[in-house]
Amino acid sequence: MKLRRIISIILAVCLISSACLISASAADTKWEPKNEQPFIFVHGLNGWGGAEDINGIMPYWGATTGDLMHYLQNKGYDCYSASVGPLNSAWDRACELYAQLMGVTVDYGVAHSAKFNHERFGRTYYQPLIPNWGELDENGKLQQIHLIGHSFGGTTIRMLVQLLTEGSPEEMAATDPEDISGLFTGGKGDWVKSVTTICTPHNSSSIYYPIVYLGLADLVQFVSYAYAGIMGRSIFNGGLVDFHLEQFGLTEIPGVGSADPYFKALRHVLANRQDSCQYDLTPEGSMKVNKKLDINKNIYYFSYAFSTTKEVPVIGTQV
């Protein structure tokens, strides 16, 4: 399964490059891929980015086969492995990804943060992952990016593109124009050249059904957040792992602190279950997310799916 995922990613990068390539002249007999835009890789549920130490032990992109980012970079591709909340909702992750790319403070939005009773602002990225993204270069060409998401990372990048393209009417209505994040004002859909999703559960995840059938949904969510809260205020926070749950006060901002009392924060985040990746991966949550998302006709879209499920005995569900 891991080998299939690696092969699919390499094929995706090659296909994106060729699809976005300006046609060579008829006299050219040798074809060479041209990569003018960076590739941003976004992990899925319980995943991690290139900045976390666990990635040096087990690269998320590449796993036991080695670091795929290094491999692609050695082939001439400009690649980055972003880090977003492994348990966060598609909305929160899109906000975190935007801030990381731009080098600004994470803004979850006035309306959204009020609806789900958490802080509006998260951490600040003092250096943009992609300098001059969305600006014109010296030749007057817009500096764009390619987005590649695995599993729930695919939902994350689709949400990011939707907000870049259309913005958020709710956030624009709730926020002073002088104070609103550029993510919520729209008009930036052309900042993205392509969107590629790999094994993304666009219409819910099959793992949802056996968990619900066995009555484990609440327990799984509790254990996930309890573990995140412990690790997110330990010496491993911001180094080995990073859960990005400071908006709920459950984890500390690396190097800053600021987490709320543990059990208070744990109750807080569990009281807002619908603002989580676990909810967005349910049939109900996926339907709500999909209603928000549209296709930008000026962006190339690729989606790769694999059938590697096995039937679970007794309940008969494919997982």
Where are these regions (language model features)?
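Sec-dependent signal peptide recognition
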Residues: 4-12
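Hydrophobic core
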Residues: 11-19
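Sec/Tat signal peptide C-region and signal peptidase I cleavage site
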Residues: 22-26
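N-terminal non-catalytic accessory region
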Residues: 27-148, 152-200, 204-219
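Helical cap/lid subdomain of alpha/beta-hydrolase-fold lipid enzymes
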Residues: 162-163, 167-319
